[in-house]
Curated annotation (Swiss-Prot):
Summary of the tissues where the protein is detected: Expressed in placenta and testis.
Organism: Homo sapiens (Human)
Tree of life domain: Eukaryota
Protein name: Down syndrome critical region protein 10
Length: 87
């Protein structure tokens, strides 16, 4: 499920408190990636998105969205709402 709605101004700060995990096809475990090393996919994306779930380190709640890997120097472009609440 991909959320492409607008996000609140404090969303990037909120996302910094979360960790991102790629849910790779065929794998039973999740491979963690820092949010700064991925970009959320958009309709203009040339690469197929990977399903990703963002977890809150404090609450343990997660929200799924689609993302694609980016270079380490690329800023994490938030196009899904990193909701800091139970899902």
């Amino acid at each position: 499920m991909q959320i492409v709605q607008g996000f609140p101004a404090d969303a990037p700060l909120c996302a910094l408190m979360w960790t991102c995990s790629f849910l790779l096809p065929g794998l039973q475990t999740e491979t963690p990636y820092p949010c700064t090393s991925l970009c959320l996919s958009s309709s203009q994306s040339a690469h197929p998105p990977l399903p990703v779930r963002v977890f809150s380190a404090e609450s343990g709640y997660g929200i799924p969205f689609c993302a694609e890997p980016c270079s380490r120097v690329t800023v994490c472009h938030l196009q899904a709402v990193p909701v800091c609440m139970p899902v």
